[in-house]
C-alpha cells in the first residue's frame, strides 16, 4: 500500500509541475486512479528514490535496523522527494542538511501518526522548493513542536520520538561503556545493541524513585548485552567500579569519556545522584533535540518541568 501511495504522490507532483493538475494528491481515489502507463513510466525513478532514501537513513541519520525506524509512513514522502531531486542533488551537503531538518522535525514533532496524505503533498512540494532555494510554506517544519515534558512520557520504543532520540545518540557516536564500540551499521548488525536503564530498574525501585522518571527515555541509552549484564541491578557507583576491574587497561578517565558520550554526567552517576543526573541528562537531550530540529523546545526550563 505504501508503495502505491508513494508512486501516486510522485506522479501527482509531476502532473502539477507540467500543468496537468492544480493540486498534489495521493489519497485513495488517486491511488486507484493512477494510470498503468504512468506507473510503468515512473517505476524506475520512484524505485531509485527509495534507494536514495535508504542510503540517507543509513548514512546520515543512523537508522540501521527496521525495528529502529521511527516512522515507516515518513518513507513515502522521503522516497518521492528523493526521486524528484535525484541522487546527485540528494548527496549535496545543503540538501542533506535541509532533508535532515525536515526528517527530524517530522519524527520529534510526531507528525506522521495518523492520516498523512495531505502532509505528504505538502512535504514533496515544500522540500523540493526549499532544496532549490525557492519560497515555500515548510508545513511540517513549522508545525513541529517538542515539549520538554514529553521526555517523561517517552517510556517505550512504540513512540517514534523515542526511537528518534536513540538514533540521535547513535549519530553523536555514543560508545559502549565496556568495549568502546560506536554503534554503526556494522556493529548494530553484529552485536545487537539495545536500550537499557542507566540507573537500573531494580535499584530505582529499592530507592523509591518514581517509575515515571526512571523508566523514561531520560534514564535510558543504547548499550551492548555484555555491558547490560555487568550493570545488572546495581547502583551506578558499584557497576562503574566493576567495569573498571573487569576491562583490562581501562582507566577511569577513559570510562568517563565513554559514559559522557551518552550525554551522562559521570560525576553525578558515580555519586548515585539520581536527581542531579536526571536533570542534567534531560537538558542534554533537549539540546540534542533542538540541534536536530533547528528550533527551540517549548517549556525549556527542564529543572522546573521535569521534577
Where are the regions a protein language model picked out?
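Short, small-residue-biased leader/transition segments that mark boundaries at the very start
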Residues: 1-5
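Structured, charged N-terminal subsegments at the starts of enzyme catalytic cores
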Residues: 7-85
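Short, hydrophobic/amphipathic alpha-helical patches that form generic packing surfaces
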Residues: 10-12, 55, 73-84, 100-108, ...
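Structural motif
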Residues: 62-73, 90-94, 156, 211-214
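Intrinsically disordered, low-complexity N-proximal targeting/linker segments that flank membranes
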Residues: 107-196, 203
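Short beta-strand-alpha-helix junction that forms the catalytic/metal-binding core
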Residues: 193, 205-231
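Polybasic, low-complexity binding patches
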Residues: 213-214, 231-260
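C-terminal, well-folded lobe of enzymatic/effector domains
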Residues: 252-307
Amino acid at each position: 500500500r505504501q508503495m502505491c501511495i508513494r508512486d501516486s504522490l510522485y506522479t501527482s507532483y509531476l502532473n502539477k509541475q507540467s500543468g496537468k493538475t492544480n493540486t498534489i494528491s495521493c489519497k485513495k481515489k488517486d491511488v486507484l486512479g493512477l494510470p498503468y502507463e504512468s506507473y510503468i513510466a515512473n517505476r524506475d525513478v520512484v524505485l531509485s528514490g527509495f534507494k536514495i532514501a535508504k542510503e540517507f537513513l543509513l548514512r546520515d541519520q543512523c537508522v540501521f535496523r527496521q525495528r529502529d525506524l521511527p516512522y515507516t509512513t515518513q518513507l513515502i514522502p522521503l522516497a518521492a522527494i528523493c526521486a524528484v531531486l535525484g541522487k546527485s542533488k540528494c548527496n549535496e551537503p545543503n540538501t542533506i542538511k535541509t532533508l535532515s531538518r525536515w526528517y527530524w522535525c517530522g519524527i520529534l514533532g510526531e507528525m506522521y501518526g495518523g492520516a498523512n496524505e495531505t502532509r505528504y503533498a505538502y512535504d514533496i512540494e515544500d522540500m523540493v522548493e526549499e532544496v532549490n532555494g525557492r519560497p515555500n510554506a515548510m508545513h511540517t517544519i513549522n508545525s513541529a513542536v517538542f515539549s520538554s515534558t514529553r521526555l517523561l512520557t517517552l517510556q517505550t520504543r512504540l513512540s517514534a520520538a523515542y526511537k528518534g532520540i536513540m538514533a540521535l545518540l547513535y549519530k553523536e557516536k555514543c560508545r559502549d561503556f565496556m568495549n568502546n564500540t560506536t554503534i554503526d551499521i556494522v556493529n548494530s548488525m553484529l552485536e545487537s545493541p539495545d536500550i537499557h536503564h542507566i540507573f537500573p530498574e531494580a535499584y530505582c525501585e529499592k530507592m523509591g524513585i518514581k517509575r515515571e522518571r526512571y523508566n523514561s527515555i531520560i534514564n535510558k541509552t543504547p548499550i551492548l548485552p555484555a555491558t547490560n549484564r555487568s550493570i545488572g541491578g546495581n547502583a551506578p557507583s558499584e557497576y562503574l567500579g566493576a567495569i573498571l576491574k573487569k576491562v583490562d587497561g581501562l582507566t577511569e578517565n577513559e570510562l568517563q569519556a565513554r559514559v559522557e558520550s551518552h550525554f551522562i554526567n559521570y560525576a553525578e552517576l558515580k555519586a548515585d545522584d539520581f536527581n542531579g543526573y536526571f536533570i542534567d541528562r534531560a537538558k542534554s537531550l533537549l539540546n540534542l533535540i533542538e540541534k536536530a530540529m533547528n528550533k527551540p523546545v517549548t517549556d525549556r526550563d527542564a529543572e522546573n518541568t521535569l521534577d
